From Swiss-Prot:
Residues 811-995 form the Lon proteolytic domain. This is Lon protease homolog, mitochondrial. One of its GO terms (biological process) is protein quality control for misfolded or incompletely synthesized proteins. Homohexamer or homoheptamer. Organized in a ring with a central cavity. It comes from Oryza sativa subsp. indica (Rice). Belongs to the peptidase S16 family.
Amino acid sequence: MLRAAAAAAAVFPSRFAAAPAVAAVEEVRSPLLRVLGALRGGRVSTLGRRARFCSNSAGSDSEAAAAEAKAEDAVAAEGEADGKASSAIVPTVLRPEDCLSVIALPLPHRPLFPGFYMPIYVKDQKLLQALVENRKRSIPYAGAFLVKDEEGTDPNIVTSSDSDKSIDDLKGKELLQRLNEVGTLAQITSIQGDQVVLLGHRRLKITEMVQEDPLTVKVDHLKEKPYDKDDDVIKATSFEVISTLREVLKASSLWKDHVQTYTQHMGDFNYPRLADFGAAISGANKFLCQEVLEELDVYKRLKLTLELVKKEMEISKLQQSIAKAIEEKISGDQRRYLLNEQLKAIKKELGLETDDKTALSAKFRERIEAKKEKCPAHVLQVIEEELTKLQLLEASSSEFNVTRNYLDWLTVLPWGNYSDENFDVHHAQQILDEDHYGLSDVKERILEFIAVGKLRGTSQGKIICLSGPPGVGKTSIGRSIARALNRKFYRFSVGGLADVAEIKGHRRTYVGAMPGKMVQCLKSVGTANPLVLIDEIDKLGRGHSGDPASALLELLDPEQNVNFLDHYLDVPIDLSKVLFVCTANVIEMIPNPLLDRMEIIAIAGYITDEKMHIARDYLEKNTREACGIKPEQAEVTDAALLALIESYCREAGVRNLQKQIEKIYRKIALQLVRQGVSNEPTQEAAIVTASEEPNGGDSANKLKDETMEDPATENAAMTNADTASKEASELDLLKRTVDHDVHPAETPKEAVLTDSALSTDKLCTPEGNKDMEGAKEESADKAVEKVVIDSSNLGDYVGKPVFQAERIYEQTPVGVVMGLAWTAMGGSTLYIETTKVEEGDGKGALVLTGQLGDVMKESAQIAHTVGRAILLDKEPENLFFANSKVHLHVPAGSTPKDGPSAGCTMITSMLSLAMGKPVKKDLAMTGEVTLTGRILPIGGVKEKTIAARRSAVKTIVFPAANKRDFDELAPNVKEGLEVHFVDTYNEIFDIAFQSETQTETS
């Protein structure tokens, strides 16, 4: 019997330990235990910790008895715990073999075999209450008996659930007559509501009825008939059962875990348990299973079980044949599909194709066929599913249009299509320099990107953020970068964007749903590696539709945008090859998580020299051509451009400068038109061109084509075009002169007609050529004079100067010091003025004006305190601050001012007033000061340096911590300046009042 127990453990390895054997039965998924899977998560497993597999009465060895005793002790302990909460207290647990009278439970579907769990639902509340009471009284047993079919019904025909309802209504003898006599002693392991979980122990047989409601019967415990475990016939039969189960396993994966576990230990088994196991997991008829349960002869029981598993084998073979037939049918369908495709092609060639759905499907398949090798597998799967769905939908349904639009977007995207990048660093440098002057930091970063791509052989997407004032070229540099890299360019502005769907797309459930901007970008450019410019990222909105800044986190994260998910497409898109360039004016407005994903490149404002280059080489030239004015007709001198920059356009960028230049050339164009100048080619010029070159039109086209094909000939072509235009203008002027001299009294219409004929005759004769040359010489004296714009007449075209000279004093008086400020318009000078209001013992005070912010007011208070300490150290006998009320003012009172960088300037102004000494001439300073006199770093070094140069300042004082920022400036910015870098205010005092300094001249 030790071998029998081991075999049972092999068959039910978890049954002998605890309830996890329910998982094995669940894997079997036999009809008997289909409902049991719902209990695996909690209810059965908790009960299984104390429920034990009950041995059959035939197994009388000590180990089986010990297992039963342990189970009974566990049940007794539970009953004792439950009994404390009730009035009935039973000190011991009834053993299974002592159960001679049990409550009868009807089983409608399958019999319960010993060693298996089964959940049933008890609808009779009285019966359910009796089971609960028995369990509390430590009698957790009941008899489970299979219900017979009604007389006159075929057991092989499935009926409705009405019979089940009638069983619940039966009581007493009526119910007893419907039950099979042989059943199973079941332990009640769990009661949850009306669900009762039973564990089979041993076979029972009803002898008589004890009670009608609930039905209670007397039972006899059945034992297997004695058998010889070494009998060859029994062994052979059991081996055949195991072999059949193995074949079932090969044919079907059903019950895989259970059969493998059992057959691994085929030498250690218990024949009765093997028979019960095979019958229990089979899907046989319930009455055949009942026959196995009733059979006490082990050999006969094995034979019955063998018949059942053989039937399962036949079912598996039938399943295989069905699967094979289906596969053959699918192959036939594929053949039919190929023939249909050929038929469609023939119809298409003959013009007989009229099915819109078929045409749409063909169009989508044709699109994706070219991208099939590069398109991800999951996208192809979605497309195939949607195409199948499209064929099943009616063309008039709304879902048809949704599916069609979805397929249109899916198939049009450039899956795996990348444009060939240009990794030529010199070519990129040339393009960037052609389009933009300056911006060395941006150009250097792009060249680094190209260099890395050249070494790797491929490039990865990056996220770059260009920050700077308006008009410095942040947006336009994006196009130049795309041209230098040979990438497609796409720009979309997110300024004021408050809807997440603009980035991530709409769900397809919404009417009029559209993909997000990134998907639209890929469709527009046709490549998967464009350069995307996200403009004004610092001005993202936030509304009820979500936070777009948070939606951009996934888009602008190189680790996440490999699988960017658009709500509309709902399939991952690879954006790892996209180069993102963002622009912002104030990076402090960008959320920190988003800012962390970007590489910041700060673009400072342009200095005067840079603006001059940009105006002369780009703005003035392009504006003149856009207005149709030739270089010989108008000129804007360098002096005019310099005055325009200094007095009208002091902002950091050049956008306003471009507007002013456009304004100048518009007025020049109006002036030229009023003088009768026209640059349009005349009819006579066309006649001359045609007479000189017979194939004039073809030559022009040829010249154009050659210019497009060979960039080296572009300048020559432009020169030829300018020459032709100039000759046409001179010819037009000649015509007007001849008209005026020859036909002064004719009406305009007659004059034009006569002149046209006359001019044509003259042009066709040698005499005409001589007259034309003479007319040219005569018209040269009468030609319109060239319009020249210089600083003297600039006001006639752009109005009065907007900015006056920032420098008010050649030599600052006592109490006045020049500071340096930094605004959105760039750098500027800022005077700090201090004067004494009132004097008297103990009247020391400070008054502030000039629309100062809180930070600047606090800085003034600190300056007042530090100034008193400095004065006490330098001139102990001077009691100015103790006895004087001081008024500090910052001019331009209508302009709000704030910031700590004027601290050292305020101290110097107060000390100048206190000592009665003016500061050094041509001196400007900036720096935040602490109460201990330390000078802290400031921002905007370049802008402040430019402002100082504009005001003819010779000496500048900067904090020592800003030396690195100053060293990075261009040489032309630092040229001619005496710069001091200080750590404490005492150094500034020596520079401002004693001129004993250690300087650094740049």
